[in-house]
């Protein structure tokens, strides 16, 4: 109703709440990643050392914490909801497609690191990104939702996220 449409109209377009939730999350991520692509196009990956691209990605997560807490919180809730509902991979095709830009960047960044040696590649690519980038995003999401033990409501935890970023960068450099 807040969007100016009724339930009937909504469910004419989406057959279930799960389908709607997936569509909204895919649209939100695509819009955010398109904004990042405009700032630093995928085509520039060859021109930038892999570690600089890696730091840019970590900084973009901190920026999300500062300016897009709603996206981080929605994504966190999305992950729990989709898991709870038992969404099948075929239901997530559009969502995964919305992450194409990020997944492509991560892969090209890792390949660039193999060439320029600016961050470690002794760990398999998927594990490296789970341990580094995904951990950073999870921390940003938890801070955005005030899910950190001992955290105070409405406090800015950017300094702690910058510290975490520095720790991750030091790990990545080996």
Predicted regions span which residues?
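Secondary-structure edge/capping motif, primarily at the C-terminal ends of alpha-helices
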Residues: 39-44, 79-86, 143-147
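Hydrophobic alpha-helical connector segments
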Residues: 23, 27, 38-70, 125, ...
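C-terminal peripheral helix-coil segments that are non-catalytic and often amphipathic
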Residues: 60-63, 104, 108-116, 130-174
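Gram-positive cell-envelope targeting signals
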Residues: 7, 12, 72-75, 128-130, ...
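Helix-turn-helix
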Residues: 1-23
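Short secondary-structure transition hinges
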Residues: 63-105, 127
